[in-house]
C-alpha cells in the first residue's frame, strides 16, 4: 500500500461492552498525539513502523478506556487529526476470522529467513570442522 490515508479503527470487546481500543494509523509525523485530559483514557506515544522495502514510514498510536461511552473521535481530540481521516461506522467490526482468510505470507521473506538459517548452520559446521582439524593437528 503506497501512501495510505490516515485511519482510526475502534475495537470493542465482544464479551464486555465497556472495554474499547482505538488504533490511529498512517498519520503524518507532524501530527501531535497528546494525552487526553480525561483520566480514564490512556494514549500511547507515537510509534513509527519503518517499512524499508516500500520506502515508507507508518505512524500509529493506541488509545483505550474502560468507559462504555468511549469513542475514538473523542480520544484524540487534543491531536490535530487530518480532515480526510477514515472513521469506520460503529456497525462495522473487525472479525479475526475474516483477517485469517485474507492473510498471505510473503514468500520472499520466508525464503530470506530460510536462507539465513541455512547460512548459520553452514557457518557452525565450518567452524566445528576447523576446530576439530586444529585440535587434531595440535595433538599429533
Swiss-Prot record:
Organism name: Homo sapiens
GO cellular component: alpha-beta T cell receptor complex; plasma membrane
Coiled coil: none
Cytoplasmic side: 139-140
Functional summary from the UniProt entry: Constant region of T cell receptor (TR) alpha chain. Alpha-beta T cell receptors are antigen specific receptors which are essential to the immune response and are present on the cell surface of T lymphocytes. Recognize peptide-major histocompatibility (MH) (pMH) complexes that are displayed by antigen presenting cells (APC), a prerequisite for efficient T cell adaptive immunity against pathogens.
Subunit organization: Alpha-beta TR is a heterodimer composed of an alpha and beta chain; disulfide-linked. The alpha-beta TR is associated with the transmembrane signaling CD3 coreceptor proteins to form the TR-CD3 (TcR or TCR). The assembly of alpha-beta TR heterodimers with CD3 occurs in the endoplasmic reticulum where a single alpha-beta TR heterodimer associates with one CD3D-CD3E heterodimer, one CD3G-CD3E heterodimer and one CD247 homodimer forming a stable octameric structure. CD3D-CD3E and CD3G-CD3E heterodimers preferentially associate with TR alpha and TR beta chains, respectively.
Disulphide bonds in the chain: 22-72
Subcellular location: Cell membrane
Main localization (coarse): membrane
Matching Pfam families: DUF1968
Lineage: Eukaryota, Metazoa, Chordata, Craniata, Vertebrata
GO BP of this protein: adaptive immune response; alpha-beta T cell activation; response to bacterium; T cell receptor signaling pathway
Region entry Connecting peptide, spans: 94-115
Domain Ig-like C1-type: 19-107
InterPro entries for this protein: Ig-like_dom_sf, Ig-like_fold, TCR_alpha_C
Domain free text: The connecting peptide (CP) domain contributes to the TR-CD3 assembly and signal transduction. The TM domain mediates the interaction with the CD3 subunits.
Key words of the record: Adaptive immunity, Cell membrane, Disulfide bond, Glycoprotein, Immunity, Membrane, Receptor, T cell receptor, Transmembrane, Transmembrane helix
Protein name: T cell receptor alpha chain constant
Annotated glycosylation sites: 32, 66, 77, 113
Disease affiliated with this protein: Immunodeficiency 7: A primary immunodeficiency disorder manifesting with recurrent respiratory infections, candidiasis, diarrhea, and failure to thrive. Patients show a clear predisposition to herpes viral infections, and features of immune dysregulation, including hypereosinophilia, vitiligo, and alopecia areata. Other features include lymphadenopathy and hepatosplenomegaly. CD3+ T-cells express TCR-gamma/delta, but little or no TCR-alpha/beta.
Transmembrane segments: 116-138
Amino acid at each position: 500500500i503506497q501512501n495510505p490515508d490516515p485511519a482510526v479503527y475502534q475495537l470493542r470487546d465482544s464479551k464486555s461492552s465497556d472495554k474499547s481500543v482505538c488504533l490511529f494509523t498512517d498519520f503524518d509525523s507532524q501530527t501531535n498525539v497528546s494525552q487526553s485530559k480525561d483520566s480514564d483514557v490512556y494514549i500511547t506515544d507515537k510509534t513509527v513502523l519503518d517499512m524499508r522495502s516500500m520506502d515508507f514510514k507508518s505512524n500509529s498510536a493506541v488509545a483505550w478506556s474502560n468507559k462504555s461511552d468511549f469513542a475514538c473521535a473523542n480520544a484524540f481530540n487534543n491531536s490535530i487529526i487530518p480532515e480526510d481521516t477514515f472513521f469506520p461506522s460503529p456497525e462495522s467490526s473487525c472479525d479475526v476470522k475474516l483477517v485469517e482468510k485474507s492473510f498471505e505470507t510473503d514468500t520472499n521473506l520466508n525464503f530470506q529467513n530460510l536462507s539465513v538459517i541455512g547460512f548459520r548452520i553452514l557457518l557452525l559446521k565450518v567452524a566445528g570442522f576447523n576446530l576439530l582439524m586444529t585440535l587434531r593437528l595440535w595433538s599429533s
